[in-house]
Amino acid sequence: MRMCTPIRGLLMALAVMFGTAMAFAPIPRITWEHREVHLVQFHEPDIYNYSALLLSEDKDTLYIGAREAVFAVNALNISEKQHEVYWKVSEDKKAKCAEKGKSKQTECLNYIRVLQPLSATSLYVCGTNAFQPACDHLNLTSFKFLGKNEDGKGRCPFDPAHSYTSVMVDGELYSGTSYNFLGSEPIISRNSSHSPLRTEYAIPWLNEPSFVFADVIRKSPDSPDGEDDRVYFFFTEVSVEYEFVFRVLIPRIARVCKGDQGGLRTLQKKWTSFLKARLICSRPDSGLVFNVLRDVFVLRSPGLKVPVFYALFTPQLNNVGLSAVCAYNLSTAEEVFSHGKYMQSTTVEQSHTKWVRYNGPVPKPRPGACIDSEARAANYTSSLNLPDKTLQFVKDHPLMDDSVTPIDNRPRLIKKDVNYTQIVVDRTQALDGTVYDVMFVSTDRGALHKAISLEHAVHIIEETQLFQDFEPVQTLLLSSKKGNRFVYAGSNSGVVQAPLAFCGKHGTCEDCVLARDPYCAWSPPTATCVALHQTESPSRGLIQEMSGDASVCPDKSKGSYRQHFFKHGGTAELKCSQKSNLARVFWKFQNGVLKAESPKYGLMGRKNLLIFNLSEGDSGVYQCLSEERVKNKTVFQVVAKHVLEVKVVPKPVVAPTLSVVQTEGSRIATKVLVASTQGSSPPTPAVQATSSGAITLPPKPAPTGTSCEPKIVINTVPQLHSEKTMYLKSSDNRLLMSLFLFFFVLFLCLFFYNCYKGYLPRQCLKFRSALLIGKKKPKSDFCDREQSLKETLVEPGSFSQQNGEHPKPALDTGYETEQDTITSKVPTDREDSQRIDDLSARDKPFDVKCELKFADSDADGD
């Protein structure tokens, strides 16, 4: 049952995922929006999918492979384009691609997938080429393709959506991709003119892999074993060890030797050194297993004896958005391949296990091993000399039983509610000599996280929004040139260049120290936070404390403050610009902490203070403070200081002259001057109102008279309106006028429509008839009306004689006889009108006075 441990961990992850995810929530201390920081961008119109990046630090040039185009830009400022070349697909190839069921607009194009250095003057470029992959050489001097038109099969995928990876080693391309149109035949190959090699087309070798990364590890110059260079491939594939109803994904690391030449009889033109092992990235205490590999970065540093590779994972059942980063020593992987146990295929009834550990004898030389000094001593100078027994064993046993475990047996970083896509790592040294591995991890929302490990805990220094449209980052590239350190990120819409740190954005020593950024230090002489990798001045006098102890900062002198004047009864908003997401902001007034629950105060955006219904007691000094926990210590910092003064408007005096002043706005200063009207002395201005408009309105001069009775004069000052208020009132007037015009036009339309149809009272119809009396009667209308009268009018006398009742107008029943029609007399207009009036007077249906009578005939005039 030991072999079922990965599956048991995977199933356990489902049960504990929601319970443990809450613990994996490191929050970025600072979040930089796209507009807040200086980012350099590169984008060409109608060009998309900037997924291939290659940096030449010697030439300070960044090569960008996109859809049907390759660009060369200045690596120090990628907005400066140096060269460009286009590689488009012919219309004939597009048509053939479309005939195979592919999209002519999105798939039948040339997506650049391989961009590798071939020599000092040329690049090796491969593209999908409308599902006919092709490769060519790009001359860097003329920046033109040489027209090689090599077959890209096995070097570049057919489908731009399929996974791929490649690395150029001494002029030979090592690639992992699909070998056919359908993408059903995966392959890891070496494209060489003298010794091309590939993997065996068998499920034990590669089972539906998703290729992620490839890199070469050079042999140590002082190695006594005379070992060979090794090329490592990283991918995720469907498990061959276990078989369930659902597919179980396993992250793998595979290795081949650079000096491999294939077998003589067995494994001809196939790898004889291909071995693969499982990568472990899990949280043992919670049972979480991260088994989908997303990206890998190999960290090389002068201080590292053995390279360290960082791998980015997500769980297969990622229903809560978990991502993890694990670090591995390359020596651990080499130990598994050199001395680990093999696995063999077996058939166990009623068991999900399909491969078990092989405990039998292992032939010599060791299967899958590179040719070293020991093999040469046994007269095996090449893989062509290896015995068939060794080659057959490695053909049947490509999978190792031992797994590659991470450093410290735990992930370096676990983050929930985010899907990481790419990773690069930089090793830097702080002022105290401590070395830190700074991880730059991109997300599927276009953001970049910068994180470090501090005493068995991860600290996300900052989050930077690289792309405004929140699109996924497809590739990351890190420059290592001293003095000019940048991160390059490629997406579907363009490339962004970002510095390693935004030290200058920290305005105080406390902010610079609390950031705990190994790239940043505080400079007391200049009172700025400087970037260590960009300064050439000595580090003496700089302040950096990776523990976050802000007490090392010098005591600040009396801090600056902002003074505000508000009107009595108004509302004040005091701003506090605290960027730290880890800090708690609170306000103090007169050495007392304000409570946001009070109806007097409120918080806007969790930082800005709102004070309602201002009074004299609200005048004073307000301080915004931040409280941040760092290593079980609480750091307090004064972020902002405001001095508030509430202006009290004195009540106007009503003897002998009453001045009433009405003001609007929260910030306004007023002066009220009282003038007496004794005798005939001239009056003085009663009111002076000063505001942004500086409005002064004196009262009208009072008429002189002989009466001694005091007169009460009320001088009303017009209200002072702010521009916003006047704009709103103007908008309201325009709105009312628009509504009035709309309903007026609607009324006219309805009126004329009813007038035309005749649906109006008798007075209106008579007026309409009077207007139309002079018009010529249409002949057809008269004939129709004459025929209608013939059919509907009968003699009232005959009708009453037959029934003994009051006569009623005869209805058109459709049974009129020819005799009735012949004997009918065509009445005149006057007779028609008289007869209709008599009929309507005698018979009013439902006792309703019908005012609409033969509206169509009114146009002819009464």
UniProtKB/Swiss-Prot annotation:
Q: List the stretches on the Cytoplasmic face of the membrane.
A: 756-862
Record Gene3D superfamilies: Immunoglobulins (2.60.40.10), ligand-binding face of the semaphorins, domain 2 (3.30.1680.10), YVTN repeat-like/Quinoprotein amine dehydrogenase (2.130.10.10)
PANTHER family (alphabetical)? SEMAPHORIN, SEMAPHORIN-4D
Q: Whose protein is this, by species?
A: Homo sapiens
Q: Which residues lie on this side of the membrane: Extracellular?
A: 22-734
Disordered as annotated region, ranges: 794-837
Q: What is this protein called?
A: Semaphorin-4D
Question: Record's SMART domains?
Answer: IG, IGc2, PSI, Sema
GO cellular component, alphabetical, reads:
centrosome; ciliary basal body; extracellular space; GABA-ergic synapse; intracellular membrane-bounded organelle; nucleoplasm; plasma membrane; postsynaptic membrane
Q: Which residues form the Sema domain?
A: 22-500
Q: Which Pfam family, giving just one, matches this sequence?
A: ig
